[in-house]
């Protein structure tokens, strides 16, 4: 009697799933208006998490720390003491 010793090999490599390959969507934070730019009341000036920049004159702070203009005017980014920054909106004299 004839004995055959056959061994079969996988025709496809086993594929493992990766735990990488995804990233969160960007939040589009940062300055939305430049220094010296004219803005209308309600315009968003700066989107941030926490108070990286503080609200100055005629600028409000939203629930998510977004800074917005309260009046029509010109944007001015300023220093507030040694290590803090603020953004203000000044009315334009007509």
Curated annotation (Swiss-Prot):
Cystine pairs: none
Post-translational modification: The N-terminus is cleaved by ribosomal processing protease Prp. Uncleaved protein can be incorporated into pre-50S ribosome subunits. Cleavage of the N-terminus of bL27 is essential for growth; it cannot be replaced by a 'pre-cleaved' or non-cleavable form.
GO molecular function, one term: structural constituent of ribosome
Pfam families in UniProt: Ribosomal_L27
Entry keywords, A to Z: Ribonucleoprotein, Ribosomal protein
Domain of life, source organism: Bacteria
Gene ablation phenotype (knockout): Essential, it cannot be disrupted.
GO process terms (BP): translation
Removed propeptide positions: 1-9
Annotated Gene Ontology cellular component terms: cytosolic large ribosomal subunit
Keyword Ribosomal protein recorded: yes
Family: Belongs to the bacterial ribosomal protein bL27 family.
Assembly and oligomerization: Part of the 50S ribosomal subunit. A mutant Prp protease unable to cleave bL27 copurifies with its substrate.
Name of this protein: Large ribosomal subunit protein bL27
Species for this entry: Staphylococcus aureus (strain NCTC 8325 / PS 47)
